């Protein structure tokens, strides 16, 4: 089978910023009980590496709409203020992002927005569901400097974390990602999965593709 080579042109949003030395995607795994601390650790790293960063340069986006994630958002907003004296706003409560507040959101309120740094959080198991994968892609493409992909390190995610870590390193090192072209039987199976997922969501396929 042949391979697909996906390439990207590095974005230069700031003339004085050399993005060649920055990782465009970093994959980080954490225990579910330590996700909040992991997010704060990432913010610490951003502040250390970019001393002029503003609160509004950072977005935290969670994949699942679970009670645990909304509770995390509430707690995180308090911790951010206590630790950095920064405000935080929640995208599902207000549509306005601002330069003086960290933007915390679920997946439904991030489309069309861009930030220098995005922390994407997946608390549960990552499946091959087309909508889940599509949302992960959307989260990771909201940043124009670095996306931090924070994943629960449960055993069920081990293979996914391994593959994404390798892919992220390839993108950061060379700007390309090499993908195996699946055989026809696998393509057919994937098409069936997409069709079933779309039917269950009762949404047009075109809408899913353009999401």
For the regions a language model picked out, list residue spans one by one.
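The feature marks helicase ATPase cores and/or their adjacent C-terminal helical subdomains
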Residues: 1-211
